[in-house]
C-alpha cells in the first residue's frame, strides 16, 4: 500500500467540517473558528457545548444537532481547540439557562475549555464544566493527580445530557443537567485494545517504514496487540503476543472493567440486578463484520460470566482514533446513574450523524444553500494602553526567540513522539511562524505594551492548540493584564526590567490557577518558574534568567512525569535517550530555546525594553 491517507490541498479539518454541514441540513459552520452549531437551538434551554482535538470523528461535531449537542468545537488533529475558538462557540449560542461544557480529561482540553468557562463566568454567564474520565486501563497509582482518560463513554454523555436539556416543555435547569451528567460519568467505564497505532494524515504512512531506531522500538510487532491503548496512541496496560483469540481478549478486557477485587481499576460496581448499557466502539480501522462479531462475544460473556444482560447495546464508530485498528468496550451502570431518566435520554429522538440517524425528504428540501456564518466578536481588538516598550528592542528579541525555537523543532518533535503525541514541536513552530508573520507584516503595535501582548495572545491562540498553546496563551494574557493593572493605578509608564519582572511573577501566579503543575513535575513549568524567579532576583538580568531557564529544562531529563500524556508512558520507552542524559520534557526544551533567542538578541542590543 502506497499510503494510508489521501493527499489534501486544503486543511483537512476544515474540509471535514464543511463536508459534515453539506450532509446535514441542521448545521451551520463558523469557518474561521472551526465551530459547528445547530441552527435550530433556542435560548430557552441549557446549551450543551463540547469539543476537542480532531481525529476522533464522529466526536464531537458529529453529535451536534437536535436532542444532542448545540455546539461542537474542533482543534487540529489530536490537539485541543484554542480558548478563542471555544469562546466563539459559547457566544454563538448563548442561553438564558446557561451552558454545560463537556470535555474529555486531557490536559490541553482542561486548560482551554476551563479558561473559556472562566471567561464566560466573568461576564455573568452560568457555565458548568463536566469532565469525562472513563478509562480503566490507567490504574489509580499511575494516574495520580492526572485522573483517568476520557474515551468512548464521552459519546454516551453527549447523548444523555443533550437529551436532558432538550426534552419536555418544562426544560431542565443547568444544575439538573450537570448533576445527571456527573452521575453518568461516575458510573462509566471503558477499556480498549488495538492491533497497531493509528496513522496521522501528513505524517509518513506507517512508522514501520522509518529508519529511526528510537521509533522502531515503540512499534507493535507483527504478532502483538496493545491492551488499553489510548485514543492518541498512548501506551496501555500491556502488550500481548501472540495475538489472542477474540474470546480470550474479551474475557481479559471484561475482567479489567468488572473485577471488584482489582483495587487499581475497580471504579464502578456492577451487579447482575443492575440495568446496564453496553457500547462497542470502533477505533476507526475495524471492519463492521468484525465489530459486530466482537459485540456478540461481549454480550455472551457478560451473560455467562457476570449474569449481566445489557438493556441497550450500541455498536459503531462513536469515538475513533483516526484509522486505529482496534475497539473499545464501554459499560454504563444505569441503575446507579439515574435509572429510567437515563434510558429516556438515550431513547430521545435525534438526527445527529454520530448517533446513526437520518433526515426526511422535507428536511433535505429545506436545506439552506449556505451554512457559513461570521464569528461573533470575542475580544476588543481596539483596546489600547499607555504602557510603552522600546519598538526596536522588542522586535529584535521576538524575532531572535522565534527563529531559535524553529531550529529546535525537529528535536522537540522527536522527544514528544515518545513523551507525548508528537505535536509539541509542530505546535510551537506554528506559534513562532505566526508571530514572525505578524512582525513581517508590521502589524504588531510594539510600542503599546498591553496591546502588543494582546495581539500576540490572539495569534498564539489561533496558531497553537494543545497544552502548549493553552499555557502560553494564559501566561501572555496574564502578563498583559498585570501591566494594564499597573497603568490603572499610576497612569502611563515605560516598561523597565524591574516592572517586567514583577508582571512576570503575576503572570506565573495566574497560570498556576489553571494547572497543578509546579517545578519538579517535568513540565514546561520546570523551565518557566526558574526563569521568572531569577529574572526577578537579578533585577531583570536576562542572561542570568536564561541560564536558570536552561538548567530547569535540562533537569526534566531526570524527573518523572506527573501531568499530560507523558505520565502514561512506560519507563522502558525513555531508555533510548539515556546517552544524552535522559528524555527531557519537550515543552520545557522549547521554552528554553525561545528564551535563549531572547537573550542573544538582548545582549547584542544592550538597550532598554
Swiss-Prot record:
InterPro entries: DhaK_ATP (IPR012734), DhaK_dom (IPR004006), DhaL_dom (IPR004007), DhaL_dom_sf (IPR036117), Dihydroxyacetone_Kinase (IPR050861). GO terms for molecular function: ATP binding; glycerone kinase activity; triokinase activity. It holds the Pfam family Dak1. Pathway: Polyol metabolism; glycerol fermentation; glycerone phosphate from glycerol (oxidative route): step 2/2. Substrate binds at residues 53-56, 104, 109. Residues 392-600 form the DhaL domain. GO terms for cellular component: cytosol. It is an enzyme of class 2 (transferase). Its EC number is 2.7.1.28, 2.7.1.29. It catalyses: dihydroxyacetone + ATP = dihydroxyacetone phosphate + ADP + H(+); D-glyceraldehyde + ATP = D-glyceraldehyde 3-phosphate + ADP + H(+). Keywords: ATP-binding, Glycerol metabolism, Kinase, Nucleotide-binding, Transferase. Coiled coil: none annotated. ATP binds at residues 421-424, 467-468, 523-524, 585-587. SUPFAM superfamilies: DAK1/DegV-like, DhaL-like. The active site is at residue 232. It comes from the Eukaryota. One of its GO terms (biological process) is anaerobic glycerol catabolic process. Residues 8-355 form the DhaK domain. Belongs to the dihydroxyacetone kinase (DAK) family. PANTHER family: TRIOKINASE/FMN CYCLASE (PTHR28629), TRIOKINASE_FMN CYCLASE (PTHR28629:SF4). Catalyzes both the phosphorylation of dihydroxyacetone and of glyceraldehyde. This is Dihydroxyacetone kinase.
Amino acid at each position: 500500500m502506497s499510503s494510508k491517507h489521501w493527499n489534501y490541498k486544503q486543511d483537512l479539518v476544515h474540509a471535514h467540517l464543511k463536508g459534515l454541514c453539506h450532509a446535514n441540513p441542521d448545521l451551520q459552520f463558523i469557518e474561521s473558528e472551526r465551530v459547528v452549531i445547530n441552527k435550530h437551538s433556542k435560548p430557552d434551554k441549557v446549551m450543551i457545548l463540547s469539543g476537542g482535538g480532531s481525529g476522533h470523528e464522529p466526536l464531537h461535531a458529529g453529535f451536534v444537532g437536535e436532542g444532542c449537542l448545540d455546539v461542537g468545537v474542533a482543534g487540529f488533529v489530536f490537539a485541543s481547540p484554542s480558548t478563542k475558538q471555544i469562546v466563539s462557540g459559547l457566544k454563538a449560542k448563548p442561553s438564558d439557562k446557561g451552558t454545560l461544557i463537556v470535555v474529555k480529561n486531557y490536559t490541553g482540553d482542561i486548560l482551554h475549555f476551563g479558561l473559556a468557562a472562566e471567561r464566560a463566568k466573568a461576564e455573568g454567564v452560568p457555565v458548568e464544566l463536566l469532565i469525562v474520565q472513563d478509562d480503566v486501563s490507567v490504574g489509580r497509582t499511575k494516574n495520580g493527580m492526572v485522573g483517568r482518560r476520557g474515551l468512548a463513554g464521552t459519546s454516551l454523555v453527549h447523548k444523555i445530557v443533550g437529551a436532558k436539556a432538550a426534552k419536555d416543555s418544562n426544560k431542565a435547569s443547568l444544575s439538573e443537567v450537570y448533576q445527571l451528567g456527573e452521575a453518568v460519568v461516575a458510573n462509566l467505564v471503558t477499556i480498549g485494545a488495538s492491533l497497531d497505532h493509528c496513522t496521522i494524515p501528513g505524517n509518513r504512512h506507517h512508522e514501520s517504514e522509518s529508519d529511526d531506531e528510537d521509533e522502531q522500538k515503540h512499534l507493535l510487532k507483527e504478532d502483538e496487540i496493545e491492551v488499553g491503548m489510548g485514543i492518541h496512541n498512548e501506551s496501555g496496560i500491556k502488550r500481548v503476543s501472540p495475538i489472542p483469540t477474540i474470546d480470550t481478549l474479551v474475557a481479559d478486557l471484561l475482567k479489567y472493567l468488572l473485577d471488584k477485587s482489582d483495587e487499581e481499576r475497580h471504579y464502578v460496581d456492577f451487579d447482575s440486578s443492575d440495568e446496564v448499557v453496553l457500547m462497542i466502539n470502533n477505533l476507526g480501522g475495524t471492519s463492521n463484520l468484525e465489530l459486530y462479531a466482537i459485540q456478540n462475544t461481549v454480550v455472551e460473556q457478560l451473560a455467562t460470566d457476570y449474569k449481566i444482560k445489557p438493556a441497550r447495546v450500541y455498536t459503531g464508530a462513536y469515538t475513533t482514533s483516526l484509522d486505529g485498528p482496534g475497539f473499545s468496550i464501554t459499560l454504563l451502570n444505569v441503575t446507579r446513574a439515574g435509572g429510567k431518566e437515563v434510558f429516556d435520554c438515550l431513547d430521545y429522538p435525534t438526527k445527529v450523524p454520530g448517533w446513526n440517524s437520518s433526515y426526511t425528504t422535507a428536511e433535505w428540501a429545506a436545506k439552506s444553500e449556505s451554512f457559513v456564518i461570521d464569528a461573533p466578536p470575542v475580544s476588543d481588538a481596539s483596546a489600547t494602553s499607555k504602557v510603552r516598550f522600546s519598538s526596536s528592542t522588542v522586535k529584535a528579541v521576538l524575532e531572535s526567540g522565534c527563529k531559535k525555537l524553529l531550529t529546535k523543532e525537529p528535536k522537540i518533535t522527536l522527544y514528544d513522539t515518545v513523551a507525548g503525541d508528537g505535536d509539541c514541536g509542530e505546535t510551537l513552530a506554528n506559534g513562532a511562524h505566526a508571530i514572525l508573520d505578524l512582525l513581517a507584516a508590521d502589524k504588531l503595535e510594539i510600542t503599546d505594551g498591553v496591546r502588543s501582548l494582546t495581539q500576540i495572545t490572539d495569534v498564539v491562540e489561533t496558531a497553537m492548540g494543545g497544552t502548549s498553546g493553552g499555557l502560553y496563551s494564559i501566561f501572555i494574557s496574564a502578563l498583559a493584564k498585570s501591566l494594564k493593572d499597573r497603568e490603572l493605578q499610576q497612569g502611563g509608564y515605560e516598561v523597565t526590567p524591574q516592572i517586567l519582572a514583577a508582571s512576570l511573577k503575576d503572570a506565573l501566579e495566574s497560570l498556576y490557577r489553571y494547572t497543578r503543575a509546579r517545578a519538579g513535575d517535568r513540565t514546561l513549568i520546570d523551565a518557566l518558574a526558574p526563569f521568572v524567579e531569577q529574572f526577578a532576583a537579578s533585577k531583570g538580568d536576562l542572561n542570568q534568567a536564561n541560564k536558570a531557564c536552561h538548567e530547569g529544562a535540562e533537569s526534566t531529563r531526570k524527573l518523572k512525569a506527573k501531568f499530560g500524556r507523558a505520565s502514561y508512558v512506560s519507563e522502558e520507552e525513555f531508555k533510548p535517550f539515556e546517552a544524552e542524559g535522559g528524555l527531557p520534557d519537550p515543552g520545557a526544551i522549547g521554552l528554553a530555546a525561545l528564551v535563549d533567542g531572547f537573550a542573544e538578541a538582548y545582549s547584542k542590543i544592550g538597550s532598554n525594553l
